[in-house]
Amino acid sequence: NLFGNNSYVYYYQSAFRPPNGWHLHGGAYEVVNVSTESSNAGTTECTAGAIYWSKNFSAASVAMTAPQNGMLWSTAQFCTAHCNFTDFVVFVTHCYKSASGSCPLTGLIPQYHIRISAMKNSSLFYNLTVAVTKYPRFKSLQCVNNMTSVYLNGDLVFTSNETKDVSAAGVHFKAGGPITYKVMREVKALAYFVNGTAQDVILCDGSPTGLLACQYNTGNFSDGFYPFTNSSLVKEKFIVYRESSVNTTLDVTNFTFSNVSNATPNTGGVHTIQLYQTSTAQSGYYNFNFSFLSSFIYKESDYMYGSYHPSCKFRLETINNGLXFNPLSVSLGYGPIQGGCKQSVFENRATCCYAYSYNGPPLCKGVYRGELTKSFECGLLVFVTKTDGSRIQTRNEPFTLTQHNYNNITLDRCVEYNIYGRVGQGFITNVTNYAINYNYLADGGMAILDTSGAIDIFVVQGEYGLNYYKVNPCEDVNQQFVVSGGKLVGILTSRNETGSQPLENQFYIKIINGTRRSRR
């Protein structure tokens, strides 16, 4: 039934006429996701004869249903519905318009008729024109991967020899909605046939009823116990940590600079300023030690004179205050305070330049044309080459990260675990109520191991005290379904699951709705 959001549909080929009885067969599609849409035509009407609206999927089947009364084949309500199988598109539309630009995909369609078409690489390769007397209103379009089948109002209107998942689908409409999109997964089904017609269907969907029926290949059971196996698909993983928090101290690389006492003056121009103690940061945390600058005098920027660092909003004394960079390189040089910094930045020797005076001799040559042979006061020039980013960060002290660990333990299903460093698969149950009165895990122990070395019982400190958990095998070889009065009423298992009741040396889990699925 396409109109039930928690429902399923079952298709079988008309040539499939098995003998009377139960038969395991493909062709069932179960709803796994539902969404609705009220309208997607922004103008006074939708555009017929064209595909204007689509939603992306990756599904075995997608069903698009209108309200049960259906929608009129009119641009005031419904225009086009389509199924996209990646390589080609199947769509149903109408278009009784002759104006220029109308019906771009189909051309004029006769009045009171609809068109079912298939298109590949912008070329139509299938066309079927049907009178609306057969389909008075649009009610549903379902796209199915098996043989790329398309069903209009429940009738098969297109199929091919390919099987492909649905990649997109949509309904373009103005009113009469909402349209409900149902994404479906393919499951096997056990169907009961009478005279070649399916009368009853049980989905092999992992539910208790599906497990029982599809394993025994029948839907009719007398009262009794029925052993069964169920291979669990592990989808979840959790970690139980030894410590509630872990502190990690990150290394800080230190670059310490010092005065160069035997530095030679430049001989004219910035390219003759020799570089010393070049230090380049790659990534991580860094500290730049310029303590020797305390005996130098910082020179502010004054036109050609002094420092020049408009691209660096910091002084060297504050470079360690958590600043972030991508590449960062620092060098020392000795050159003229007059023009040495500004011209070095202009000629791309550095991004920024900081000038310091130490009352040096006037032995440095000029850096500008016409001043290359003139002598100026020598000073200390600190060159910084950088771009902003996040790979490098400066720090005044080592940096400590604190990681807080939270133990979110997944119960009552097969999971992958990492418990205090031991890994494996298991079915975890809470046994605190059974272990609280016994001397489990004495002397501060955290886990009890079985003979194979795997974890059997482990303890976790909870908000209100210690909690004990048992690791069971994912597959219970002793589990049995219980049938009473022809209905599935419970499960006998050797595992103490949440909500189970002790029954001698086993546990009983009651099934509230154990009746088999019936055809809707």
UniProtKB/Swiss-Prot annotation:
<feature type="glycosylation site" description="N-linked (GlcNAc...) asparagine; by host">
    <location>
        <position position="146"/>
    </location>
</feature>
<feature type="glycosylation site" description="N-linked (GlcNAc...) asparagine; by host">
    <location>
        <position position="220"/>
    </location>
</feature>
<feature type="glycosylation site" description="N-linked (GlcNAc...) asparagine; by host">
    <location>
        <position position="5"/>
    </location>
</feature>
<dbReference type="GO" id="GO:0019062">
    <property type="term" value="P:virion attachment to host cell"/>
</dbReference>
<feature type="glycosylation site" description="N-linked (GlcNAc...) asparagine; by host">
    <location>
        <position position="127"/>
    </location>
</feature>
<comment type="similarity">
    <text>Belongs to the coronaviruses spike protein family.</text>
</comment>
<feature type="glycosylation site" description="N-linked (GlcNAc...) asparagine; by host">
    <location>
        <position position="254"/>
    </location>
</feature>
<keyword id="KW-0165">Cleavage on pair of basic residues</keyword>
<feature type="glycosylation site" description="N-linked (GlcNAc...) asparagine; by host">
    <location>
        <position position="56"/>
    </location>
</feature>
<feature type="glycosylation site" description="N-linked (GlcNAc...) asparagine; by host">
    <location>
        <position position="161"/>
    </location>
</feature>
<dbReference type="GO" id="GO:0016020">
    <property type="term" value="C:membrane"/>
</dbReference>
<comment type="function">
    <text>S1 attaches the virion to the cell membrane by interacting with cell receptors, initiating the infection.</text>
</comment>
<keyword id="KW-0325">Glycoprotein</keyword>
<keyword id="KW-1161">Viral attachment to host cell</keyword>
<keyword id="KW-0946">Virion</keyword>
<dbReference type="GO" id="GO:0044173">
    <property type="term" value="C:host cell endoplasmic reticulum-Golgi intermediate compartment membrane"/>
</dbReference>
<keyword id="KW-1162">Viral penetration into host cytoplasm</keyword>
<feature type="topological domain" description="Extracellular">
    <location>
        <begin position="1"/>
        <end position="520"/>
    </location>
</feature>
<feature type="glycosylation site" description="N-linked (GlcNAc...) asparagine; by host">
    <location>
        <position position="84"/>
    </location>
</feature>
<dbReference type="InterPro" id="IPR043607">
    <property type="entry name" value="CoV_S1_C"/>
</dbReference>
<feature type="glycosylation site" description="N-linked (GlcNAc...) asparagine; by host">
    <location>
        <position position="195"/>
    </location>
</feature>
<keyword id="KW-0261">Viral envelope protein</keyword>
<feature type="glycosylation site" description="N-linked (GlcNAc...) asparagine; by host">
    <location>
        <position position="408"/>
    </location>
</feature>
<keyword id="KW-0472">Membrane</keyword>
<keyword id="KW-1043">Host membrane</keyword>
<dbReference type="GO" id="GO:0039654">
    <property type="term" value="P:fusion of virus membrane with host endosome membrane"/>
</dbReference>
<protein>
    <recommendedName>
        <fullName>Spike glycoprotein</fullName>
    </recommendedName>
</protein>
<feature type="glycosylation site" description="N-linked (GlcNAc...) asparagine; by host">
    <location>
        <position position="121"/>
    </location>
</feature>
<keyword id="KW-0843">Virulence</keyword>
<dbReference type="GO" id="GO:0019031">
    <property type="term" value="C:viral envelope"/>
</dbReference>
<comment type="function">
    <text>S2 is a class I viral fusion protein. Under the current model, the protein has at least 3 conformational states: pre-fusion native state, pre-hairpin intermediate state, and post-fusion hairpin state. During viral and target cell membrane fusion, the coiled coil regions (heptad repeats) assume a trimer-of-hairpins structure, positioning the fusion peptide in close proximity to the C-terminal region of the ectodomain. The formation of this structure appears to drive apposition and subsequent fusion of viral and target cell membranes.</text>
</comment>
<keyword id="KW-1168">Fusion of virus membrane with host membrane</keyword>
<keyword id="KW-1170">Fusion of virus membrane with host endosomal membrane</keyword>
<feature type="glycosylation site" description="N-linked (GlcNAc...) asparagine; by host">
    <location>
        <position position="230"/>
    </location>
</feature>
<feature type="glycosylation site" description="N-linked (GlcNAc...) asparagine; by host">
    <location>
        <position position="430"/>
    </location>
</feature>
<keyword id="KW-0945">Host-virus interaction</keyword>
<keyword id="KW-1164">Virus endocytosis by host</keyword>
<dbReference type="GO" id="GO:0055036">
    <property type="term" value="C:virion membrane"/>
</dbReference>
<feature type="glycosylation site" description="N-linked (GlcNAc...) asparagine; by host">
    <location>
        <position position="289"/>
    </location>
</feature>
<feature type="glycosylation site" description="N-linked (GlcNAc...) asparagine; by host">
    <location>
        <position position="513"/>
    </location>
</feature>
<keyword id="KW-1160">Virus entry into host cell</keyword>
<dbReference type="GO" id="GO:0075509">
    <property type="term" value="P:endocytosis involved in viral entry into host cell"/>
</dbReference>
